[in-house]
Amino acid sequence: VKSVGANLRTGGPATANNEWIPDFVNYCEKNSVPLDFISTHHYPSDDPNWNADMHLDNFFGEEVNLNSDEIDRRGLLTKMVRIAKHEAGNLPLYYTEWNTSANEGDEFHDTPYSSALVTKTLIDNYGYVEAYSFWTFSDIFEEHGQVPGEFRGGFGLQTIHGIPKPVYRAFELMHQLGEER
C-alpha cells in the first residue's frame, strides 16, 4: 500500500474484541509492516470478564441495586478503551463499530438507558479515541434479514421508518454542544 502512496495510512484490522491489539502491534513491529492506526470494534459483551449467561436487562432491571458496580456498564466500555489505548501506544485509536449491545433484537437498543450509556461513554472517552462510529444509523439492516416493526431492538439510531430512538436524540444533543465540553 505504501509503495502506491506513501501518504496512505494503514491500520486495522477492525475486528471485534480488543484483546488482539498487542499481538497485532507486535506482529507489525517484528515484520516491518507499516501501522499508522488501530481500528477495532467494541460492545459490552466483548469484555473477557463478561458472564455469558447474563443479559443486559440484568444490569438495568428494577431488581438491580443502583449503588452496585453492575449498573455501571459505561465503566466497562471506558475500561476497555483505556486498555486498548494503552496497548495501541502512540497509535491513534478508532472504534469503527460500537453499540450498547452486540445482539440484534436486544430491546435495550430502544430504551433511554441506551442513550444514557452512549452519552456517558462518549464523555468518558473524549480525548482517548480519535473517532467513534456508532453501529448503525438505521434499523434497516440486511445481515440477518429485515425484521418488521418499530422499536424491536434493532441496532439503529432510527427505526425502519425513520423514527428517532432515544440514542439518536443523545447524539443530536451532543452535536448541539459543538466543541463545548
Question: What is the predicted function of each stretch?
Answer:
Residues 1-132, 150:
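Noncatalytic carbohydrate-binding groove/subsite architecture in carbohydrate-active enzymes
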